[in-house]
Amino acid sequence: MKVFCGRVNPTTGAMDWVEEDEHYDYHQEIARSSYADMLHDKDRNEKYYQGICAAVRRVKQRGQEAVVLDIGTGTGLLSMMAVTAGADCCYAIEVFKPMSDAAVQIVKANGFSDKIKVINKHSTEVTVGPDGDMKTKANILITELFDTELIGEGALPSYEHAQHNLMQETWEAVPHRATVFAQLVESTRLWSWNKLFPLNLETGDIKPHPELETCPGAPSVCDIQLSQLNPRDFKILSEVLCVFRVDFSCQVSSAPTSHPVHFTSLASGAAQVVLSWWEIDMDPDGSITCTMQPSWMYETQQSVPWRDHWMQCVYFLPKECSVTQGEVCCLTAHQDDYCVWYSLNKSSAENDPVCRERPTCHCGAHITWNRARFGELNDRHRTQQYFEALKKVVTPSSTCLCVSDGSLLPVLAHSLGAKQIYTLESSSIAQHLMKKLFQVNHLGEKIQVLHKSADSLITADFEDRKISTLIGEPFFTTNLLPWHNLYFWYSRTALSTNLAKDCTVLPLSASLHVVAVEFKDLWRIRSPCGMCEGFDVSIMDKMIKNSLNFRESQEAEPHPLWEYPCRALSEPIQVMTFNFTEPVPTEEIRASGSLNLVRSGQCHGAVLWMVYELTKEITVSTGLIGISEEMGECQWYPHRKQGVYFFSSILNPQTIPAQSPSSVSYSVTFIPKEGDIRMCFEPDF
């Protein structure tokens, strides 16, 4: 059955009514899931298998039947491991219906249907008894309920309920325990993702609103591939601290609690950020350990496992705190049932009661700007580029309009002497935030914030003035892919009647660029697995492929590529240009050609990004900013996500051609009516 779904188009700003299959949502969830990534995580799979074998063996040595409960079974992989290890029966719980159906098929295909029962319920709804979902309570608890923060997917409440209701009086658990580690650091780069720094201009400093300075920030964890952070970007202030452990073989509590750890500071500095990760011991002895520690904790880089479903965490302290080398401090990890946060005290005094509450943004900035956007606004080199460009177009007679969400361009325009400045904000929270920022810097009367869309503006909004200078970064909070910021072009088109005949537009244009790449690891998230630890999971591969084909097989997907190393196999090329000095055309813009591969390697996909021509002399890239000559290692703009188009024919180990492609053919079409860019890439052999 088909249904009509209303979606705001991020490029045009219009409400699009799209006819979708009724199962679109779960196809999208499967297509964007990390199931394939987990199946490719050999370190994780091997450690789980070893831990499961050991747990079954311990139960059998006590003369008991091994009854396994597997919560969040996914493909059924861990359940099949348990039965292969000698478990008598296994109850595999999976709440997501399409995944549960796949698990039933995978279990059957591997010949385990007689010992594994897949239950399509949330674990808290499972019943035990002669007529229940489980005939008897289990004595082995196997789970993979963890996220990067360990407890963010509700692991603690699930464990708590299962141990109370679904487990025997004593049980074995795989994993047996989890340990959370933390390290206190000073880092201007990371801190710039959480606070707005003062903006130093020739006419004076622009300071953030005091509310932003005292705001504890966003409640969600910042999870990144910490191994890709340059060690020069932070200063270590503490040893790696063991902050708390969770023993899954004992009764777990999801009640809020705190874990204070005293330490002696290794260096003097500004304590700003806590780097954190966890490890799980699969057995009571701790001889089978799976760790999420970053690469610099390993003796050799060859032994570092790569995974994207579990990364590392960056936590921002509520406020910056100076510490002195040799000073005794107390770092406290606070947790509730789903979240962890940190506070720092410089004495053994009781923690500030406020820190016991989950941090919540009260300034509006952490709701308006995500962490990458904070970093972009604090990027001094980028700001200087825009400042130099604005110098060329802003005059004392300029009436400026800024079309970008939460932008500081109006402040730059004012510092250059513009007569009148207006700025559009798409949300009431952003409008309130920017008004406060302008007011605290005595710019409230000089920069007017308009909470309207471009197509709803009338002459009266500009006090009967014509806009002489239209400016934008452009950046909009609704953007997912690089070309979604072409919303600036659609806004410029809607504003045509409000623009002076000789209106200057900055940027002048945007261009779409592409390069063919070999990823070090990111390709794994879209690569079929086939066999995993001796079990056939190809049904899962087909399920993911079907969901990708359902909608996303011919689409790029957004990834912050500074976290994912890759090599350029072709030279980057410009494939399409969008002229902002003219309205959006009615005719489609088409481009086709080929990327000649100049370096050897597995060509996993193409990366796309936008470059903005601010003036004839100044351009800014939201993607590639450098390539090493010899190996072709790419350096990416860190504040935006790039578009990645994976080549399915090369990602499948079973269909990889014997020879590498010599080039990649492309066809790209911009469809003005839809505000969409359709693309097709084909490796040429």
UniProtKB/Swiss-Prot annotation:
Q: Which residues form the active site?
A: E144, E153
Q: What InterPro entries does this protein map onto?
A: Arg_MeTrfase, MeTrfase_PRMT7, PRMT_dom, SAM-dependent_MTases_sf
Database matches in CDD domains? AdoMet_MTases (cd02440)
Q: Which Gene3D superfamilies match?
A: Hnrnp arginine n-methyltransferase1, Vaccinia Virus protein VP39
**Gene Ontology BP annotations:** chromatin remodeling; genomic imprinting; peptidyl-arginine methylation; regulation of DNA-templated transcription; spliceosomal snRNP assembly
Please tell me whether the keyword Signal is annotated for this protein.
no
**Residues in domain SAM-dependent MTase PRMT-type?**
14-341, 353-680
Any Pfam family from its record, for instance, is PRMT_C
Name of this chain's protein:
Protein arginine N-methyltransferase 7
